[in-house]
Amino acid sequence: MVTPESIQLNIAQGMVTEHLSVVGDGAHFEAVIVSEAFAGKNRVQRHQLVYQTMGDRMREEIHALSMKTYTPQEWQSQK
C-alpha cells in the first residue's frame, strides 16, 4: 500500500526541497513542495519535475496526487 511517507521519500530522494509534506488516504494524496528547482518554471513543468521523482509509481500505484509547488520565495510570501 502506498503511504504519504513513501511518496515523501520518493520526492526527497529525487530532488532537493526546502519544505516537503504529503498527506493522503492510500489512494488520494496532497503534497506541498518547496524547491529552488521550480524557479522559472510554470505549473506544468513543476509537476513534471515531481512526477519524474515518482517513476512508474504514478501510473501503477498512485491514483491521484494533488500538488502545490512553490519556490522558496513564493513559499515565504504564503506564510
Which positions does each model-derived feature cover?
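N-proximal, solvent-exposed amphipathic alpha-helical segments enriched in charged/polar residues
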Residues: 1-18
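Histidine-centered active-site/metal-ligand motif
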Residues: 28, 47, 63
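A short interface-forming secondary-structure element
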Residues: 33-45
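Charge-rich, low-complexity N-terminal segments
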Residues: 2-3, 7, 26, 57, ...
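Charged, amphipathic alpha-helical segments and their flanking helix caps
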Residues: 43-44, 48-53
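Solvent-exposed beta-strand sheet faces enriched in polar/charged residues
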Residues: 23, 32-34, 68-70
